[in-house]
Regions:
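Extended C-terminal regions of large enzymes
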Residues: 7-8, 14, 24, 140-516
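Protein-protein interaction/assembly regions in multi-subunit complexes
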Residues: 1-180, 184, 189, 193-199, ...
Length: 516
């Protein structure tokens, strides 16, 4: 039976409650925030909640259904991201539809541990100052290499705005990642070191009709694999594909005939997928175009940021520095891509030498928690607040991807005549929310968005999972309710700059589904 776990770190209580009727996925995450956190609370207040909600299809035999929504209140209304790795499927396989963590642990740092029906809160001394990799190794050494972990590292301990979560992968290399869009300051403020799930199943979520779900899941997999981006360019050439599409929607790179995708020369088992059930594969396949291979998409993003901000460096130096920054950022639990943009601003303002040595020294300042390091760890927004009179600085402050969404011109099919009054941009956002509600990887959006047959399959998969018949229209209507609810939360915050929190990946979708 699916349930919601409510964990209060202040009084160390653990409670359960029923899943609200008709709520699932990202929509459920926002509902839990409203129910269990104090409206108007500050981002780092004990009154805030840290919520993890697997997608409705996560934990089932559905391709690319590997995601969970992570959310909390924020000074800008709310913070929300989508994570993958081995945690979402194992959490769902334990029958946990939502995890709510509130309060603040006052006796050092703690971990929340789940194993079957057992749930515990306990202190984890001796991990302060350790890198994320060392934290993962310590936990897996004690609780087994098959346990799934999300948590915070040194950057989260300092509650830096650029801190992120680390999320483990199944056993292999890489061991973990720090998603760029995640946030580690909220769990860091609760003194929550890690959430640990011990479960030997990835596909243990209850399904009303598992046989039919597996059959329809195979049909969905075929749509994804047959797509030229999801089944060709992404697994073959990696995130360089995304960089091409940002420039031109038709610039889908092709792997030269007879040439195999680049592979890193590493010993031991390699993870090519972030979680079991992924049919795309985005790990250890990302070529820089010059033979250099990135182990994960995040590394390619750091390299792209380096090329944008430090283009005067040689290609070899860009590769070397980007790799070093990415690894160091991962070890700290720091958003290395945003670090590059912020450090570039700081170097210019402080009139420092624009060299790779300067850049590498600044990330060590952040690791030490020095004044310059903490300032850079605050992101471009922190520097922007120091220079409100400088338009050139304000233009470089990172904004949400959909800040100027009203200027976008999309070209989508009218999937459902009953919803003919919905604009194309709203329709795009609703389809993104359907994927997040169901737990589907955003990379599969190239194959699934704007396709009636994909919408029908997703509706059938919902029915197989729950036993309740729904139509594509109902999925879109629920997504619309989720969008409206989030807009209301943002409206309550005077600091909110956008009505909706849409994944950064939407920049690519704007281009791909935009008008010519």
């Amino acid at each position: 039976m699916s349930r919601i776990l409510i964990i209060d770190l202040t009084d160390k209580s653990i409670k359960e409650e029923a899943v609200p009727t008709g709520r699932y996925g990202r929509g459920l995450a926002m509902e839990l925030i409203r129910r269990h956190s104090k409206e108007g609370c500050e981002r780092l207040s004990p009154d805030n909640t840290f919520v993890v909600v697997p997608g409705l299809l996560t934990g089932c035999h559905v391709p690319c259904a590997t995601r969970a929504t992570v959310a909390a209140r924020s000074d800008n209304g709310f913070a929300v991201t989508s994570i993958t790795g081995d945690m979402p499927q194992k959490l769902a396989s334990l029958g946990i539809s939502g995890l709510v963590i509130k309060g603040r642990y006052e006796c050092g740092r703690c971990a929340v541990y789940m194993d079957g029906d057992a749930v515990r809160i306990f202190p984890v001394p001796g991990m302060d100052g350790l890198t994320c990799g060392d934290i993962v190794e310590n936990i897996r050494k004690k609780y087994g290499s098959d346990c799934a972990v999300i948590g915070t590292g040194p950057a989260g301990d300092m509650r830096l705005p650029l801190s992120g979560l680390f999320t483990t992968y199944p056993e292999g290399t890489p061991r973990f990642t720090c998603p760029r869009s995640s946030f580690g300051d909220v769990p860091g403020s609760k003194n929550l070191r890690a959430v640990i799930v011990k479960c030997n199943k990835y596909f243990g979520a209850e399904c009303a009709d598992e046989e039919r779900l597996i059959r329809d899941g195979k049909a969905l997999a075929r749509l994804i694999i047959d797509d030229p981006i999801c089944g060709g360019a992404l697994p073959g050439l990696g995130s360089i594909t995304i960089l091409h599409l940002l420039k031109n929607k038709n610039a889908i790179p092709e792997l030269p005939k007879g040439k195999k995708p680049c592979r890193p020369e590493k010993a031991g088992r390699l993870n090519y997928c972030c979680a079991p059930g992924c049919v795309i594969g985005c790990l250890n396949r990302h070529s820089a175009g010059n033979g250099h291979v990135f182990s994960a998409p995040e590394e390619a993003e750091v390299r792209a940021a380096m090329a944008h901000c430090f283009g005067e460096l040689s290609e070899e130096e860009l590769d070397r520095t980007a790799s070093a920054l990415s690894k160091r950022g991962m070890s700290l639990g720091l958003n290395a891509t945003e670090f590059v943009y912020t450090a570039a601003m700081y170097i210019e303002l402080a009139k420092l030498s624009k060299t790779s040595e300067t850049l590498l020294s600044l990330i060590e300042e952040t690791a030490r928690g020095s004044v310059p390091g903490r300032l850079i760890g605050g992101g471009t927004a922190a520097l922007g607040r120091l220079y409100p009179d400088r338009e050139d600085i304000q233009r470089r402050v990172t904004r949400p991807a959909n800040t100027k969404d009203s200027e976008r011109r999309m070209s989508l099919h009218k999937l459902c005549p009953e919803l003919g009054d919905i604009g194309d941009l709203e329709l795009l956002y609703r389809q993104i929310f359907i994927m997040e509600n169901l737990g589907l990887c955003i990379f599969s959006s190239f194959a699934l968005i704007n396709r009636p047959e994909a919408m029908e399959l997703m509706a059938r998969l919902y029915s197989c999972r729950t036993g309740e018949t729904v139509t594509p229209v109902q999925l879109l209507e629920y997504a619309g309710e989720c969008l409206a609810a989030e807009a209301d939360m943002a409206k309550d915050s005077a600091a909110a700059s956008v009505r909706h929190s849409i994944p950064e990946f939407v920049k690519v979708l704007y281009r791909y589904f935009g008008e010519e």
